[in-house]
Regions:
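Helix-to-loop junction immediately C-terminal to a conserved catalytic motif
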Residues: 48
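Conserved ABC ATPase "signature" region
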Residues: 103-119
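Catalytic Walker B motif of ABC-type/P-loop ATPase nucleotide-binding domains
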Residues: 147-151
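Conserved ABC transporter NBD signature motif
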Residues: 56-67, 71-72
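Conserved ABC ATPase signature
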Residues: 122-129
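Hydrophobic anchor residue at the start of the ABC signature
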Residues: 136
Length: 222
């Protein structure tokens, strides 16, 4: 189980996260929706250990990553919105870096993301969509129990987008927890839980209220 309690964060005098809380159980997929600049990416960076919060607590599978930073590495996979890859390195070398060792990634992972023939290719030679695939593969290379994804289907063609969503269902079927941001209606409606971020405050949308009109109303500044 994942428990996020009262996470806060400020940049200077601007508070961008205001006592954000959520929880997730094994096999759940959670989506967070909101306007650009509302705090979604900041929250995901904190949950992935890429940024420290000003306050609050995290509990991942009974461990506290804010007290023991190695928990982030053991428990989390992170796919940021921006390209996290090192362009001057090959696909294989990037995957080895993300896997924290020099072993080759397993074949099933390479087949899933269709990277078998690209391992020696420099990332700088790849298209935006292919870079996204490599980023996704890097995010799951350590087989994390908690997968954090910032708009994971951005830059993917419609066919591969569907393949990724089918893969996520299998991941959830193995008790994996997915937390992702999205602007896509289908992804919002398919999730187990939906939250809206507005000006640093996180609102949970009840299943009976989950429709695009309600979600759009929540995103509007009061």
């Amino acid at each position: 189980m994942i428990e996020v309690s009262n996470i806060s964060k400020s940049y200077g005098k601007k508070q961008v996260l205001k006592n954000v809380s959520l929880d997730a159980r094994a096999g759940e997929r959670i989506v967070i929706v909101g306007r650009n600049g509302c705090g979604k990416t900041t929250l995901l960076k904190i949950l992935a250990g890429a940024m420290a919060p000003d306050g609050g607590s995290l509990n991942y599978f009974g461990e506290e990553p804010l007290k023991d930073k190695t928990v982030f590495r053991r428990s989390c996979g992170y796919v940021p919105q921006e390209n996290p890859l090192m362009d001057e390195l090959s696909v294989l070398d990037n995957m080895r870096l993300w896997g924290y060792d020099r072993r080759n990634p397993d074949r099933a992972l390479l087949e899933q993301f269709e990277l078998e023939k690209l391992l020696k290719t420099k990332v700088s030679k790849l298209s935006g969509g292919m870079k996204r695939r490599v980023s996704l593969a890097c995010g799951v290379i350590s087989h994390p129990g908690f997968l954090i994804m910032d708009e994971p289907t951005a830059a993917l063609d419609i066919c591969y987008r569907d393949e990724l969503l089918q893969w996520l269902k299998k991941y959830q079927g193995n008790s994996g927890i997915v937390l992702m941001t999205t602007h896509e209606e289908a992804e919002i409606m398919e999730a187990d839980k939906c939250y809206v971020m507005r000006a640093g405050i996180l609102f949970k949308i009840d299943d009976g209220q989950r429709n695009m009109k309600t979600i759009l109303d929540y995103t509007k500044e009061s």
